[in-house]
C-alpha cells in the first residue's frame, strides 16, 4: 500500500515510479529528471517506507552530465543480484509461512499474531547491523531495530491485505533520543491505531507486553517524537489492548488481583488511569498487591512503564526489587534513568 506516494506531487510521483521500476530489476543506474537533492532524498525515503520488499536497496549516489535535463542515480545494493534473489526467495517463503494460517481471520486477530511474532521471534539488535534495518533481519535472522521491525510488520500486513503504514518520527538529541524512530499505524475495524512492536519487544520480561498495541494519538505521543511525514489521525481508543484491565481505583485492582492469585498467575499486567503515576501511588498499589500476595505465601514486585501508565506485577517466592522503572525506547535513547515523581 503506497501511502506516502499519495503525498507527492505528480512530477515526484514520476520519479518514485522510475526508482521503483529500476530497483525491482536491480538496475546499476537509473535515469531520472534533474530534481533537487532534498526532493530526491524525500522521494527515496517515502519509497523505502512504502515498499518493505526493497530490503536490498541501502542508498544511492548521483551523477550529473553538464547541461543535461536529467541525472543518473546509482543505487547501492546490499548484495549482488544472485544473493538478492536468494534472499528474496527466503523472505517470500517466510512471509507465506507466517501469513498462511492468518488468511481470512479478523483484522484484530491478524494484528495480534503479527505483534506476537515480533515479540516471540525477534530480538533487538544493539549492534544495528545493516540487514537489521530491513525486513531481512527480523524475517531471516531473528534480529532487528525499529526500522526493520516496523517494515516487517508492514510486509506481513500487506500480504494479508491489512491496511498498514510505517510511521517515522524525528530524533530529539536534546532529550537523549539519538535516532529517528519507526513504528506502525494500522486500520482495525475502520479506525486508525498506533502499534509499536519494537517498544513492546523491549518491555517484555517473562510475559508478552502490549503497552503500545492500538494506542490513540494522545497516548502514543507521550513518548514518541514529532513526525517526519503526516499520518492519519488516530483519535479512537476502543481497541487499546489493556482497555479491559484499565483501573481508576485501588478496589478495582484488588478484585482482579485476587482472581489472578487464586489462579496462581505469576504475573499480572494492567493500565492505571486513576491519576498521575507518582511514587506514592505506586507504593500504595504495590502495598495492596503485597498484602494479597503474602496471604498466599508470595512476594510482590512491579515494573512500570511510566509514560503509558502500564504496570506489571510479579509474584514470586523470593524478594525482588520493589519497583523497577522500564524504558521502552532503550535501543534508540541515550542511557539515562527514567524517574517517577514523588
Where do the language-model regions lie?
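Linear, non-domain "peripheral" regions
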Residues: 1-94, 262, 278-342
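An N-terminal amphipathic alpha-helical segment
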Residues: 1-26, 124-125, 238-273, 332
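Structured segments of extracytoplasmic/periplasmic soluble domains
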Residues: 46, 50, 94-101, 117-121, ...
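Short coil/turn segments at secondary-structure boundaries
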Residues: 58-61, 127-134, 272
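Secondary-structure boundary elements
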Residues: 77-138
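Solvent-exposed loop/turn segments at secondary-structure junctions
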Residues: 79, 121-125, 146, 171-175, ...
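Hydrophobic/aromatic-rich core segments of domains that either
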Residues: 148-220
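Metal-dependent nuclease catalytic core centered on acidic motifs
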Residues: 212-300
Amino acid at each position: 500500500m503506497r501511502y506516502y506516494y499519495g503525498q507527492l506531487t505528480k512530477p515526484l510521483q514520476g520519479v518514485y515510479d522510475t526508482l521503483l521500476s529500476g530497483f525491482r530489476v536491480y538496475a546499476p543506474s537509473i535515469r531520472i529528471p534533474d530534481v533537487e537533492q532534498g526532493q530526491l532524498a524525500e522521494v527515496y525515503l517515502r519509497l523505502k517506507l512504502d515498499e518493505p520488499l526493497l530490503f536490498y536497496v541501502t542508498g544511492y549516489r548521483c551523477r550529473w552530465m553538464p547541461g543535461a535535463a536529467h541525472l543518473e542515480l546509482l543505487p547501492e545494493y546490499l548484495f549482488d543480484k544472485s544473493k538478492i534473489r536468494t534472499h528474496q526467495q527466503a523472505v517470500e517463503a517466510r512471509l507465506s509461512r507466517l501469513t498462511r494460517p492468518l488468511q481470512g481471520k479478523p483484522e484484530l486477530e491478524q494484528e495480534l499474531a503479527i505483534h506476537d511474532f515480533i515479540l516471540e521471534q525477534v530480538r533487538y539488535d544493539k549492534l544495528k547491523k545493516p540487514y537489521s534495518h530491513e525486513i531481512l533481519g527480523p524475517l531471516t535472522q531473528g534480529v532487528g531495530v525499529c526500522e526493520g521491525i516496523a517494515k516487517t510488520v508492514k510486509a506481513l500486513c500487506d500480504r494479508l491485505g491489512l491496511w498498514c503504514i510505517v510511521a517515522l518520527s524525528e530524533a530529539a538529541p536534546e532529550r537523549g533520543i539519538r535516532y529517528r524512530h519507526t513504528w506502525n499505524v494500522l486500520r482495525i475495524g475502520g479506525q486508525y491505531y498506533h502499534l509499536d512492536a519494537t517498544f513492546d519487544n523491549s518491555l517484555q520480561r517473562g510475559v508478552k507486553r502490549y503497552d503500545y498495541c492500538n494506542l490513540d494519538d494522545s497516548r502514543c505521543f507521550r513518548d514518541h517524537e514529532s513526525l517526519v511525514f503526516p499520518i492519519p489521525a488516530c483519535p479512537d481508543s476502543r481497541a487499546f489492548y489493556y482497555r479491559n484491565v484499565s483501573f481508576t481505583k485501588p478496589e478495582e485492582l484488588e478484585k482482579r488481583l485476587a482472581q489472578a492469585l487464586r489462579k496462581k498467575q505469576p504475573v499480572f499486567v494492567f493500565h492505571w488511569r486513576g491519576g498521575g503515576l507518582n511514587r506514592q501511588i505506586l507504593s500504595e498499589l504495590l502495598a495492596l498487591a503485597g498484602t494479597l500476595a503474602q496471604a498466599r505465601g508470595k512476594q510482590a514486585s512491579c515494573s512500570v512503564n511510566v509514560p503509558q501508565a502500564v504496570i506489571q506485577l510479579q509474584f514470586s517466592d523470593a524478594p525482588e526489587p520493589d519497583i523497577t522503572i522500564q524504558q521502552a525506547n532503550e535501543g534508540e535513547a541515550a542511557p539515562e534513568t527514567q524517574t517517577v515523581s514523588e
